[in-house]
């Protein structure tokens, strides 16, 4: 049996976040994650060096562009490549643009669950190795 080939964009929206600047960081507020925090979330580890943006900034972004919601997937795209995180129901955070690829608005919730588990496979990691760029700091774009 031969299966049709489709692009990931036919299943989900592939995007990233809006730019957050250092002067947007605050002492308390909504967690702001970079790639290393996404890796920690993937491992269910504690984030010790937490960054934050204000609730006002977060809700402004949420109203205009959307924020990660349950079932979305973030994949690290700089440094340690290809680590997926499946956003949970109680997650409230934003993330650094360029550090993660954001898969959202799947055609069904099962699509993201399937993709998440596929991203954990050696097959996916082999695909990433074939498209990564950079010598000292690996990246996918």
Where are the regions a protein language model picked out?
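Short, solvent-exposed loop/turn positions at domain surfaces
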Residues: 19-20, 59-62, 89, 134
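Short, surface-exposed loop/turn microsegments at beta-strand edges and helix-strand junctions
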Residues: 23-32, 44-53, 65-69, 85-98, ...
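Glycine- and charge-enriched low-complexity intrinsically disordered segments
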Residues: 112-130
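Non-catalytic DNA-recognition/assembly elements of restriction-modification systems
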Residues: 1-22, 27
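Structural motif
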Residues: 71-73
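Short, charged beta-turn/beta-strand-edge "cap" motif at the junction between a beta-strand
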Residues: 79-83
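Hydrophobic pocket-lining residues within nucleotide cofactor-binding pockets
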Residues: 38
